[in-house]
């Protein structure tokens, strides 16, 4: 599905990612773990097409995702439809309009009929436990509600892959559990999920693969949950991120 080979990304004044190679398979639930600034968010931006690698190769379903490819607006739109992203700060992706209009925006851009848009909005609001929020606007929502509405708007495009940047950050324990349960349902429905987190305790029960970054912006390990169960020292290290 996704193949990254020797990916590097440089910001003007620092390294963002260094020599990253990774394969993502359909149906994976991957947690990107590591300290703040280690490259987790940078990787999500690259996967979503919001940035291009400085060097290395990125393929999605055997299609090279290059700077030239992303320069084409239609290519970018197609990639964003198939790989959806929920940002850590959801305020950057929510409009100052009702939740219904927020979720309807994407399907309308796809040219769906009014009836199909209405049905998709209803389905996505129901799936994300947001049906009771349909007439609200962002300033009336809690942090957890904003995250779920942002996820509903992404799901309205029916992506294959969901990217989530620290989706549990700032949420109450109840809202965290609600989000994790929702993500498990989405994986069971066939979605591939890649989420960034610095809190292993929050995600250890749902993640199936754990990509662990170190402070030098490199991948230190790619481990399954079973692998980690056999490495208590590694688990203890992750608990201190």
Swiss-Prot record:
Positions contributing to ATP binding: 34-41
Chief localisation class: membrane
Domain ABC transporter, residue spans: 2-240
Keyword hit for ATP-binding: yes
Membrane topology: Peripheral membrane protein
Enzyme class: translocase
Disruption phenotype: Deletion of both larO and larQ leads to a loss of lactate racemase activity. Addition of Ni(2+) (but not Co(2+)) restores lactate racemase activity in this mutant.
Gene3D superfamilies, sorted: P-loop containing nucleotide triphosphate hydrolases
GO CC terms in record: ATP-binding cassette (ABC) transporter complex
GO MF terms, alphabetically ordered: ATP binding; ATP hydrolysis activity; ATPase-coupled transmembrane transporter activity
GO terms classed as biological process: nickel cation transport
Induction, per UniProt: Induced by L-lactate but not by a racemic mixture of DL-lactate. Makes part of the larR(MN)QO operon.
UniProt subcellular location: Cell membrane
EC number from the UniProt entry: 7.2.2.-
PANTHER family on file: ENERGY-COUPLING FACTOR TRANSPORTER ATP-BINDING PROTEIN ECFA1, HEAVY METAL TRANSPORTER
Family designation: Belongs to the ABC transporter superfamily.
Protein task: Probable ATP-binding component of the energy-coupling factor (ECF) transporter complex LarMNQO involved in nickel import. LarO is presumably responsible for energy coupling to the transport system.
Quaternary structure (record): May form an energy-coupling factor (ECF) transporter complex composed of an ATP-binding protein (A component, LarO), a transmembrane protein (T component, LarQ) and a fused possible substrate-capture protein (S component, LarMN) of unknown stoichiometry.
Protein's recorded name: Nickel import ATP-binding protein LarO
Organism: Lactiplantibacillus plantarum (strain ATCC BAA-793 / NCIMB 8826 / WCFS1) (Lactobacillus plantarum)
Recorded name of the encoding gene: larO
């Amino acid at each position: 599905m996704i193949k990254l080979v020797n990916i590097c990304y440089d910001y003007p004044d620092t390294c963002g990612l260094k020599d990253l190679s990774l394969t993502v398979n359909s149906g994976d639930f991957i947690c990107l773990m590591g300290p703040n600034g280690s490259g987790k968010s940078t990787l999500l931006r690259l996967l979503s097409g919001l940035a291009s690698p400085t060097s290395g190769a990125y393929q999605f379903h055997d299609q090279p995702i290059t700077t030239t490819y992303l320069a084409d607006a239609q290519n970018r739109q197609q990639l964003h439809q198939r790989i959806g992203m929920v940002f850590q700060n959801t305020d950057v992706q929510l409009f100052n309009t009702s939740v219904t209009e927020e979720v309807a925006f994407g399907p309308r851009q796809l040219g769906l009929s009014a009836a199909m848009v209405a049905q998709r909005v209803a389905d996505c609001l129901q799936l994300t436990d947001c049906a009771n929020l349909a007439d609200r606007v962002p300033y009336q929502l809690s942090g957890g509600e904003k995250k779920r509405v942002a996820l509903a708007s992404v799901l309205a495009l029916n992506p294959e892959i969901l990217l989530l940047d620290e989706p549990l950050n700032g949420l109450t324990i109840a809202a965290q559990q609600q989000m994790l349960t929702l993500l498990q349902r989405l994986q069971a429905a066939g979605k591939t999920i890649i989420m960034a987190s610095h809190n292993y305790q929050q995600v250890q029960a749902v993640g199936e693969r754990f990509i662990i970054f170190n402070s030098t912006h490199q991948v230190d390990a790619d481990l399954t949950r079973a692998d980690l169960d056999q490495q208590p020292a590694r688990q203890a290290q992750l608990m201190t991120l």
